[in-house]
Design a protein with these regions (language model features):
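Acidic donor-binding loop of glycosyltransferase active sites
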Residues: 263-279
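Donor nucleotide-sugar binding/catalytic pocket of nucleotide-sugar-dependent glycosyltransferases
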Residues: 130-172
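Glycosyltransferase donor-sugar binding loop
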Residues: 219-237, 254
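Nucleotide-activated donor-binding/catalytic signature segment of Leloir-type glycosyltransferases, i.e.
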Residues: 236-256
Length: 370
């Protein structure tokens, strides 16, 4: 654990921002980045980190004392970080969170998960939302999903996009040998798990080669730029076999260190983000931040993001055949690679500081700070 504060010095208006989990986890990274952005906009913030649930339990007395002195206690929560099941995660948090805590809830349950999983996770998230004084989600889409579970008000603070286009333009995109050839590939960024879009990308490439013929020069490899989610190692073998049966290739790079992430995103031939059940996406934000315009499946969340940041996505409406529609979008990118880059006038706001101000306004209202 790091960042333990002297709670005797906690003034009203101070924020204890808590992250739980491995530093490379997307929700944990988001929490750390949000805490830093809150500081940059002038908030008094102390970041408390715990790499597992046991360490988090050790923070509980600190959180209780801080709340007693008027400080805000805010956590980023996805159920998988707090227990082996959603029910266990909710049991823990409902039991130990101090009165007046607030949460940003991630990975809101949705029906496409399947009846049993949706019911279990939905009940857990409903309990969490009812147990705290303020709930934040990352999109209007997520707020609607939460409203289907529980009658609790939730504020929307979008995932920020850091505009790194200028720095990216100056940098030479050098990637490790294990990522060589990205410029020839269709590339998905982030964790590998079912429904992320890898299978659809292979179907789309198959359709494109069917239309264009075997020697067309269209991409023949799909690269998953990121690690495999826990429990889904079998998916890699399944996708590899599927690709080979189609005359294509599939590879997984594994975890991408921060020092290579931007270079890898810049090097990618065709950015692809066809999440089946996406409700908030750090991988979409990553593509956008370096100036890439990803091909994305149209849906309530991606359409919301396209309205929030016009010009940042190439939305694909299936119109009967998702693979055929995606093949058309990939064909456009092959014929005109400039389509995979953002136009010079595209605005990427809200950024990290904008979103930090939104969150602080929520905390100010919840805690009635003057």
């Amino acid at each position: 654990m790091k960042g333990i504060v002297d709670v005797d010095s906690q003034p009203q208006g101070r924020v204890l921002y808590v992250t739980v989990g491995a530093p490379e986890h997307g929700v944990v990274r988001h929490g750390r980045q949000t805490a830093a952005a809150l500081r940059r906009v002038g908030a008094e913030v102390e970041l408390l980190t715990a790499e597992d649930v046991a360490a988090f339990r050790g923070l509980v007395p600190v959180l209780e004392e801080a709340r007693a002195l008027g400080a805000a206690v805010h956590l980023d929560v996805t159920d998988a970080l707090f227990g082996p099941t959603a029910t266990a995660a909710a049991d823990l948090l409902v039991d130990v969170l101090p009165e007046g805590a607030t949460l940003t809830l991630h990975d809101i349950p949705q029906p496409a998960e399947g009846d049993g999983r949706y019911r279990r996770r939905g009940e857990a998230y409903a309990r969490l939302a009812q147990a705290v004084d303020g709930v934040v989600v990352s999109s209007q889409h997520e707020r609607a999903l939460l409203a289907d579970l529980v009658d609790v008000a939730a504020d929307v603070v979008p995932l920020p996009v850091e505009d790194r286009r200028a720095a990216a333009a100056r940098a030479e995109p050098v990637v490790p040998e294990s990522m060589a050839g990205l410029d020839q590939d269709v590339v998905l960024f982030g964790f590998v798990y079912p429904g992320k879009g890898h299978a659809l990308a292979l179907e789309a490439l198959t359709e494109l080669h069917r239309q264009w013929g075997p020697d067309s020069g269209a991409p023949r490899r799909l690269t998953a730029l990121g690690p495999v989610s826990a429990g889904h190692d079998d998916l890699v073998a399944e996708l590899t076999r599927d690709a080979e049966a189609r005359g294509l290739e599939f590879r997984v790079t594994g975890f991408v260190p921060d020092e290579f992430a931007d270079a890898a995103l810049l090097s990618a031939g065709i950015p692809f983000a066809a999440h089946r059940n996406v409700s908030a996406s750090g991988s979409l934000a990553a593509w956008t931040s370096v100036g890439r315009r990803a091909i994305a499946s149209a849906g309530r969340y991606t359409e919301e993001m396209a309205r929030l940041r016009p010009g940042t996505l190439r939305l694909v409406h299936p119109n009967g055949s998702p693979a055929f529609a995606m093949a058309e979008a990939i064909a456009e990118a092959v014929e005109d690679p400039e389509r995979t880059w953002l136009g010079p006038g595209v605005d990427l706001s809200p950024g990290a500081e904008d979103c930090a101000r939104m969150l602080f306004d929520v905390l100010r209202r919840v805690h009635r700070w003057t």
